[in-house]
Amino acid sequence: MAAIAVAGVGLMVVCSSSLAAAMMMGGEEKEDPIVPKTPVVPVVPTLPSGQYVKLVHTSLTDVINLAELEVFTKAGTTNLATGKTVTSSAFHPAGPLPNLVDGNMTNFAHTMNEIAATGDSMLIDLGSVQEIEKIKITNRVDCCQERAIGIKVIILGADGTTVVKETPAITTNAATYTFTFPGTAWV
């Protein structure tokens, strides 16, 4: 049971933790012999590392139709995807796959939606395992921007199958989408 003592202008609550009471009164903090202090070590989130970046449409009936995909490391200045190999389930001849990583924001890459059982996807091989901090998708400017809704990004390991990180699907219609790890949403 706690007792309350009033002395002068101070009020002291005496209880099982006299250390806390002493601190409230301006006394010096002394290490509790029962619960020693442990240093606080900040937790720094790790960035995903992968060799493949896969765009997947969550709708089994929609196509992927985008102007550009950019992938950046922590330094953030070099686009790792520029000029890399892009493969797909099937592509539309009006939107060749290399357009996705050519640096030109006015052309586009386009899938065909021929494999309804799995939905459309595009796979970019970065050439080696890279630490990835940011992914930027540029939508088409001339039409069909709503087609980006439902696309998510999956970072895969060196074997091309091990999932390292997966973003949520895009839910809004916009000109560009940026995902910065360890984030939780596209902006």
Please tell me what each predicted stretch does.
Residues L69-V71, I135, V153:
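Extracellular beta-strand elements of beta-rich domains used
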Residues A2-K30:
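Single-pass alpha-helical membrane anchors
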Residues G26-V44:
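Ser/Thr/Pro/Gly-rich low-complexity linker/stalk segments immediately outside membranes or between
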Residues L55, I124, I137, V153-I155:
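Preference for bulky hydrophobic residues occupying beta-strand positions
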Residues L55, E131-D142:
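A short beta-strand element within beta-rich, extracytoplasmic domains
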Residues P42-G50, L60-V129, R140-R147, E166-W186:
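Disordered, acidic Ser/Thr/Pro-rich linker "stalks" and the adjacent N-terminal cap
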Residues C144-D159:
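Short, surface-exposed beta-strand/strand-loop-strand elements in extracellular ectodomains
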